[in-house]
Amino acid sequence: MKKIILLLLIVIALAAGGVYWMKAGNPNALRHIVLDQCVPNQIQNRNPAPCAQVKTDAGYVVFKDRNGPLQYLLMPTYRINGTESPLLTEAHTPNFFWLAWQSRSFMTLKHGSEVPDSAISLTINSPTGRTQNHFHIHISCLRPDVREKLNAAQGEISTQWLPLPGGLEGHEYLARRVTENELVQRSPFMMLAEELPEARDHMGRFALAMAQQSDGSFVLLATERNLLTLNRASAEELQDHQCTILK
């Protein structure tokens, strides 16, 4: 009984710490940058600064994150909080994951030489795994150890959401194989909500990641928040913003 009480106290402390961390900074900083700076500057002056790109017609911007030499963020030009937003499973919402993958070229431009697709990953964190309240997909390098595990498990990843053997970074992950054609036609948010019963009404519990495999297919990864196992559902843990994989 004492162990259970101690565990609950640890979970409560971690949850409280996460809330404090989010409130300690400005959780709306990215939203202000997009809505009050990038979009108006593009419309008025045809200059996306401080963003790297503004696509008002397509509904997104690309912004260079200060964390890491090659990390970029893809964000909508309108208010969407994150994985918990019902807008992400509506047909009219842009396919942000596919748009983020198409924006990976900014990494190569910044790097000055080609960044191979095998080194690139996309992630979005859950509400408990993020510090900003404006929807943003991290476009950055994949951790080398995660790359190795995905390579080793390539033959075991199917077209259904199934547990990835051994998990990643100490947390349980579901993996699903998708083709490029599937990814173009259907958002990973829709795939998760429509194919995983427990996710349909609780999308905010999940974080998502994506990487390309050696055969040209993509692997989608989803992890669900579980404070009992100290999992805040922060898929960004699979990324290395210092890009060791390129060295």
UniProtKB/Swiss-Prot annotation:
**Keywords in UniProt for this one?**
Cell inner membrane, Cell membrane, Hydrolase, Lipid biosynthesis, Lipid metabolism, Membrane, Phospholipid biosynthesis, Phospholipid metabolism, Transmembrane, Transmembrane helix
Main site of residence? Answer: membrane
- Keyword Cell membrane appears in the UniProt entry: yes
As recorded in UniProt, its EC number(s) are: 3.6.1.26
Q: Gene3D superfamilies recorded for this chain?
A: HIT family - CDH-like (3.30.428.30)
Q: Name one GO molecular function term.
A: CDP-diacylglycerol diphosphatase activity
Q: In which pathway does it act?
A: Phospholipid metabolism; CDP-diacylglycerol degradation; phosphatidate from CDP-diacylglycerol: step 1/1
Sorted alphabetically, the Gene Ontology cellular component annotations on this record are:
plasma membrane
Q: What class of enzyme is it?
A: hydrolase
Question: Does the record carry Signal as a key word?
Answer: no
Give the UniProt subcellular location, in the record's own words: Cell inner membrane
Where is the chain membrane-spanning? Answer: 4-24
Q: Superkingdom of this entry's organism?
A: Bacteria
Identify this protein by name.
CDP-diacylglycerol pyrophosphatase
Which species is this record about?
Enterobacter cloacae
Provide the gene name from the record: cdh
